[in-house]
Structures are given as C-alpha cells and as structure tokens.
Amino acid sequence: MDQAAETHAEIRDAVAKLCAGFPGEYWRKLDREMAYPAEFVTALTESGFLSALIPEEYGGAGLPLSAAAVIMEEIQRQGCNGAACHAQMYVMGTVLRHGNADQKQRYLPKIASGELRLQAFGVTEPSSGTDTTALRTTA
C-alpha cells in the first residue's frame, strides 16, 4: 500500500470512529425537529476534518482534495449527513483562490479553528436563476 492510500485509510478509520458517536437516533431526532446538527459539525471541526483543505499556514491540514473526498464519503457511508458540513469544507476554497492576503489571514484561521463557519454561497444559472432544482441541461 502506498503512503497516500495508508493516509487515506487512517483518515477513513478516524472519520468512522467519530461518526459512531452519532447514531441513527441522533439523525432521526434532528430530522423530526428540522434541526441543524451543530454537535456533529463541531465534532468534525474539532477533529480537524473540516479544515482538511486549508493550508497548514492558516491552521488547516493542507491535505489534497482526495483526502477531503474520503472524509465526505466516509461520513455518508457511516449513515451521517454530510450535507450539513460539506460547504464548510469546500466554500473556503473561494477565499483561498480569490481572496487577497489580508482576507486569507483574517478568515482562513478562523474557519480552520471553527470560530467562523462559512457555509453559504450564491448560485445563479441562466435558465433557473437561484432555483437550482429547476436547472435544465442536456448531455
């Protein structure tokens, strides 16, 4: 097994262990109450999983996209809901790619530590505006 595969196996195992603390009843209760899984997102943040893509210089792990994919895949595999946290992992990429040095220094360490949650982004499509469920496309 190569080093990258070993690292990803360790990540997968660690995510599975964390997810075991959030059984089906936790998710069913949140679903009934239409509530946000704050405890789950906090646990992922504190474990460093949601800052996987943030460079080390800003307090993240600086891992490759493949590691982030493994994290999200394992969350779903374990029966947890990655929808509540995937934006925290990926939206910061906009700041990383397009932010100036001051913005990166101001926001990325706070996102990495969990002090700031950046989980929103705007979408607009020519045929449906912001209603992505009405999007039409052809292959």
PLM regions and their residue ranges:
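Glycine-rich flavin
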Residues: G24-A139
